[in-house]
Amino acid sequence: MKCRRCRAPAVIDVRRHNAGFCAECFTRHCREQVRRAIEDHDMIHEGDRVLVAVSGGKDSLGLWQLLRELGYDADGLYVGLGIGDYSDRSGEFARAFAKRHDWPLLEIDLLDTYGFDVPRGARAAKRVPCSACGLSKRHVFNDAAVTNGYDVLATGHNLDDEAAVLLGNVLRWEAGYLGRQHPVLPAAPGFARKVKPLVRLGERELAAYCVLTDIDYIVEECPMAAGNRHLGYKEMLNQIEERSPGTKAAFLFGFIERGHERFADDAVDEREDLRPCSECGAPTPGDVCAFCRLRTRAAAQRIPLRAEAEA
């Protein structure tokens, strides 16, 4: 196979584009896809300070590098979730990447800062770990961005991630979630603008980008993610994509272009009646935000924190 652009030998084929690329042209393709996502959805404005949530994985580290290559003022944020050796190794990859490039990395440890970690939070909430993890990350990410004066919070959600989430929301007709499922969530009082610049790149493309640009990342999946239904949705979409390349992109982009607005009012309604949390000040529809309620439940657990994190 030849590179679509320069006709040199291709190192990767991107089936949904029906194209192969050499290493140099492929990395340029990745930059162009991110640039297009940013421009099409007005994600980042001139002079914006961007905080990139990094986990040590391919998507977030790749995103940080791509934003820097495109000239954006982007710093990193790593949140230690207390998931045993997995969190320890993830932090090592994030720190090594930041040190290699001499880029600022803000670090927040969930246990040290808030008194609990994901394993204890999951047990306290009596839910699957991903629920406690997602709630905690959303709160800490936004708080870090707002507190430290960043205009934009960027996350490494890619095309595969967003298509799987969309499938789950459609299967359950989650109107509020469908109204918020967009590459950009605008800034609001107490909220930084949230953007997903990788929405035009799939997991396989990002893995290839990291290999070709020598980004060292943690390969292992989170050990607490077993049973996450979105992994099942991803597998379903992968099977469809194998038979019909481009289906995931058509599904997601079709919704963004033609379906998202139909649910926009449901999302707006959920943000109209927000007030400051009585404990942390974060916007919430009730007196106490969900994160602070989780924190209170976790504090009531009697199991030693570090022991549970390492279990």
Predicted regions and their residues:
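Short, low-complexity, intrinsically disordered N-terminal peptides in bacterial proteins
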Residues: 1-5, 9, 304-311
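Flexible helical/loop "lid" subdomain adjacent to adenine-nucleotide binding pockets
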Residues: 31, 39, 45, 49, ...
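ATP-dependent adenylation/nucleotidyltransferase module used to activate substrates
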Residues: 2-180, 184, 188-191, 200-213, ...
